[in-house]
């Protein structure tokens, strides 16, 4: 018997009915996991099964033999389709039932069918199921046990109906349940790719095999079930609305946004409705992301949040919302979802504060950028240049993807190659004229340092040292006292902090005293005075205070490893590449090193391998370093390497790796090469005429680098279902396949369009010596539509006036293509295809043009297409009769 839930319709009822159905069948309810996953290989929780992945892979104990959940998910890979199609979302909920070595295929299928037909009340005649092409067992269960019409059981290929955790490991076939919105079309030639007719709402994964390195499938002793039912999709079906956005899960947010904009969703054109859908969808996503601990930034999941927030603001402005409104949308989203996710209300203040802060920051950016972009668009360019896009980005902080989005709305593209070129030119200018600190502040620091004695450096002997504050700068002005929250620059009488110099970055750490903590972010040198840059985290600091200066030992160790590795790299280059190589510059950071050197040619891949092997050999040999001070002439006589053009004192510090390297150096180093651990070259490239650059990592940074690479390799391996060593060949093969498929598809579309068009010729209207044909032809791309129009014009003769319009994707009203082909006699009459079709396109919210005899244009309002074609026909009838 089904649970006592009478035909659920509302989203909350659907969720409750699903969970109750499976709980009554022995499944343990599992709360939704965070959108920030435990799995480090993914930024966000993208699927309902992700929290259970370690269980399926045998890495974690199962929570119960059977489980059920409603998991919140975020996907942004198709963000440009959000609002434009009926079913694309960023935030969505996946209802799932899972079996960990308990029940299997027949039980999962029977329950899925029972839930769909008896609990949700779907008519079996409106359902279609898919199975993997080789899964005879699943087909037999659907046909013989459940009783599905065999014509409504569709076999699909591996790409659609076979799940794998990677190139090796657990895997198995899938079976999906689709809802048919047009059952009257019958059971013949069912095409599940027809999104206007079918929607897949339930996916059943049968994990029954283990695949080895050779690709052999072995049946698993313990088989698993992983299913997913899209809550938004089931709501669309049960509520009888045309798309997921008009369900009660999202539509209240659309109404909120419409109210803020003073518009009526039902009365808007496609563009306006799309903006409201984007706002509704993204408002759910950003609210949930912030609730789970994501903050806006320019990296990782923080960048995803920032991009979503900015898209909401951008689409609000398109609707005429000029004032801040994200807080209002956040309030509405919390109210809509808090019953299912009570933590939203618990973290309300945090969520709203982040929304308000990020919107204020972006509105300032947006207003400046939109004004400049409007000027660019007013000139009606064919393309937004890379220089223009870069000016928007560099001067106004306008994101490139936003420029691309606005350009697309106007039927334009952005010169991305030009943008990258402008970006690189800016990097070079920044290097030449870099000023790392405000001039006013710099002046105050220089003045402070000029009046002080040299700072005694104690960092060679110890990482902790008692010191006295001898000078202080706050807000660019000399000061006697600073308080919590102040950003300060200060000088100590003596310090264990290494000040930036010789290519090595300054130390990090803290100053500590009674009820005092000062975080030190960097240290640099003015003459021989070490200036510490930091923030007072707690307490008050005054000139004359005694503090304990503590260097962060982890940062120091990592800098030391990279500095000694830099010395080894120079020695190895002299040995492997050319003994005359000399240093041109360097950077020694906590997580990487960069070494520039004079060399007339690139270092070959074989030489790079030799360099790595040689350096790692020296590391393994555990050479103890010897550091001593000696007269400059004695050091040079001993063979110590000095940097050309550098001025040295009479007495210098010499860092010696016996038998390997000897250099003049004031930086910090490991005591023994074994402390470096490992060395890895990341890149080699030219940076100027006769100067090459090697970037590398050492110590723990090598593991971090390799882990990043490993994640990428694993993702590619899983995506392509091949062994890591086969990825390159697989990519090359796919590129060739894509090239061939693209060419074949273009040819097929062109042929199809011409074939469809041939039948249209009979519909041409004779007007004197002219033949007029205006028709709609959907499902054909721009090239195909041009071929069709040209073919018809050729067929109808010199007096032909052919206008064709259509939607390349009939389910997407956001893209319209229009083509005009005029014969010689029509052109001679003063009609130009380019001008004419451009005017027609404006009726569809677009533009375009071309030659007098053949032209193409585009639009964004598919709902206006029929009316535009009618006006085109009427206009040409009048012109040709004249």
Curated annotation (Swiss-Prot):
GO terms for biological process: alanyl-tRNA aminoacylation. One of its GO terms (molecular function) is aminoacyl-tRNA deacylase activity. Signal peptide: none annotated. InterPro entries: aa-tRNA-synth_II/BPL/LPL (IPR045864), Ala-tRNA-lgiase_IIc (IPR002318), Ala-tRNA-ligase_IIc_anticod-bd (IPR018162), Ala-tRNA-synth_IIc_core (IPR018165), Ala-tRNA-synth_IIc_N (IPR018164), Ala-tRNA_ligase (IPR050058), Ala_tRNA_ligase_euk/bac (IPR023033), DHHA1_dom (IPR003156). Pfam families: DHHA1, tRNA-synt_2c, tRNA_SAD. Keywords: Aminoacyl-tRNA synthetase, ATP-binding, Cytoplasm, Ligase, Metal-binding, Nucleotide-binding, Protein biosynthesis, RNA-binding, tRNA-binding, Zinc. Its EC number is 6.1.1.7. It comes from the Bacteria. Belongs to the class-II aminoacyl-tRNA synthetase family. Catalyzes the attachment of alanine to tRNA(Ala) in a two-step reaction: alanine is first activated by ATP to form Ala-AMP and then transferred to the acceptor end of tRNA(Ala). Also edits incorrectly charged Ser-tRNA(Ala) and Gly-tRNA(Ala) via its editing domain. This is Alanine--tRNA ligase. It comes from Synechococcus sp. (strain RCC307). The lineage of its organism: Bacteria, Bacillati, Cyanobacteriota, Cyanophyceae, Synechococcales. The gene is alaS.
């Amino acid at each position: 018997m089904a649970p006592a839930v009478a035909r659920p319709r509302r989203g909350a009822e659907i969720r409750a009915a699903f969970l109750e159905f499976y709980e009554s069948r022995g499944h343990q309810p599992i709360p939704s996991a965070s959108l920030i996953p435990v799995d480090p290989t993914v930024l966000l929780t993208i699927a309902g099964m992700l929290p259970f992945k370690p269980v399926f892979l045998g890495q974690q104990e199962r929570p119960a033999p059977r489980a059920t959940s409603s998991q919140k998910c975020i996907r942004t890979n198709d963000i440009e389709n959000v609002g434009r199609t009926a079913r694309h979302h960023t935030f969505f909920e996946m209802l799932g039932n899972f079996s960990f070595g308990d029940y299997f295929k027949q039980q999962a299928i029977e329950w899925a069918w029972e839930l769909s037909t008896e609990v949700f009340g779907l008519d079996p005649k409106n359902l279609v199921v898919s199975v993997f092409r080789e899964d005879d067992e699943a087909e037999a269960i659907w046909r013989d046990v459940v009783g599905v019409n065999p014509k409504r059981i569709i076999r699909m290929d591996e790409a659609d109906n076979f799940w794998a955790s990677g190139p090796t490991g657990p895997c198995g076939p899938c079976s999906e349940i689709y809802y048919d919105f047009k059952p009257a079309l019958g059971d013949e030639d069912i095409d599940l790719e027809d999104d206007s007719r079918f929607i897949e709402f339930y996916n059943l994964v049968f994990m029954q095999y283990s695949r080895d390195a050779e690709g052999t499938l072995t049946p698993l002793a313990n088989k698993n079930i992983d299913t997913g039912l899209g809550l938004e999709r089931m709501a669309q079906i049960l509520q009888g609305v045309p798309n997921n956005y008009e369900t009660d899960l999202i539509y209240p947010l659309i109404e909120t946004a419409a109210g803020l904009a003073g518009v009526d969703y039902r009365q808007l054109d496609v563009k306006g409705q799309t903006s409201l859908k984007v706002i509704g969808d993204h408002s759910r996503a950003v609210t949930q992301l912030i609730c789970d601990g994501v903050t806006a930034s320019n990296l990782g999941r923080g960048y995803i949040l920032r991009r979503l927030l900015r898209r909401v603001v951008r689409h609000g402005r398109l609707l005429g919302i000029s004032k801040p409104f994200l807080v209002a949308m956040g309030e509405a989203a919390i109210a809509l979802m808090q019953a299912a996710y009570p933590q939203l209300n618990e973290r309300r203040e945090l969520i709203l504060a982040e929304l308000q802060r990020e919107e204020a920051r972006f509105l300032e950016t947006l207003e400046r950028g939109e004004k400049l972009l409007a000027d660019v668009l007013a000139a009606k360019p064919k393309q937004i240049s890379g220089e223009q896009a870069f000016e928007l980005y560099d001067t106004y902080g306008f994101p490139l993807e936003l420029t691309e989005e606005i350009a697309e709305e106007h039927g334009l593209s952005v010169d991305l190659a030009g943008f990258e070129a402008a970006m690189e030119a800016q990097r070079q200018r920044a290097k030449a004229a870099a000023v790392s600190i405000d001039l006013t502040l710099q002046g105050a620091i220089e003045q402070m340092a000029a009046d002080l004695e040299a700072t005694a450096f104690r960092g060679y002997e110890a990482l902790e040292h008692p010191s006295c504050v001898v000078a202080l700068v706050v807000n660019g002005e000399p000061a006697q006292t600073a308080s919590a929250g102040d950003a300060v620059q200060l000088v100590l009488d003596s310090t264990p902090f290494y000040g930036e110099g010789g290519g090595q970055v300054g130390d990090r750490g803290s100053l500590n005293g009674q009820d005092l903590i000062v975080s030190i972010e960097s240290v640099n040198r003015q003459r021989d005075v070490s200036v510490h840059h930091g923030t007072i985290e707690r307490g008050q600091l005054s000139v004359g205070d005694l503090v304990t200066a503590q260097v962060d030992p982890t940062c120091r160790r990592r800098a030391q490893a990279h500095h000694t590795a830099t010395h080894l790299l120079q020695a190895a280059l002299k040995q492997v590449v050319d003994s005359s190589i000399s240093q041109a510059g360097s950077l020694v950071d906590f997580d990487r090193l960069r070494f520039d050197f004079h060399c007339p040619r690139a270092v070959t891949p074989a030489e790079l391998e030799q360099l790595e092997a040689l350096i790692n050999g020296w590391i393994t040999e555990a050479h103890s370093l010897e550091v001593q001070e000696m007269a400059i002439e004695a050091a040079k006589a001993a063979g110590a390497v000095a940097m050309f053009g550098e001025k040295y004192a009479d007495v210098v510090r010499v860092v010696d790796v016996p038998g390997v390297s000897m250099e003049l150096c004031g930086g910090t180093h490991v005591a023994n090469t074994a402390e470096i651990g490992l060395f890895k070259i990341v890149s080699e490239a030219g940076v100027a005429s006769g100067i090459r650059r090697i970037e590398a990592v050492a110590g723990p940074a090598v593991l971090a680098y390799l882990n990043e690479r490993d994640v990428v390799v694993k993702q590619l391996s899983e995506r392509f279902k091949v062994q890591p060593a086969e990825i390159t060949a697989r990519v090359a093969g796919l590129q060739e396949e894509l090239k061939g498929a693209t060419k074949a598809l273009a040819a097929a579309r062109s042929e199809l369009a011409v074939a469809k068009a041939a039948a249209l010729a009979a519909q041409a209207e004779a007007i004197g010596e002219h033949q007029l044909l205006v028709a709609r032809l959907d499902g054909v791309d721009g090239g195909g539509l041009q071929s069709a129009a040209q073919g018809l014009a050729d067929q109808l003769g010199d007096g032909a006036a052919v206008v064709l319009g259509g939607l390349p994707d009939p389910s997407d009203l956001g893209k319209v293509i229009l083509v005009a082909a005029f014969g010689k006699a029509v052109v001679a009459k003063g009609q130009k295809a380019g001008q004419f079709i451009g005017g027609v396109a404006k009726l569809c919210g677009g533009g375009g043009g071309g030659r007098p005899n053949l032209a193409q244009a585009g639009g964004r309002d598919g709902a206006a297409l029929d009316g535009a074609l009618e006006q085109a026909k009427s206009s040409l009838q009048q012109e040709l009769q004249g």
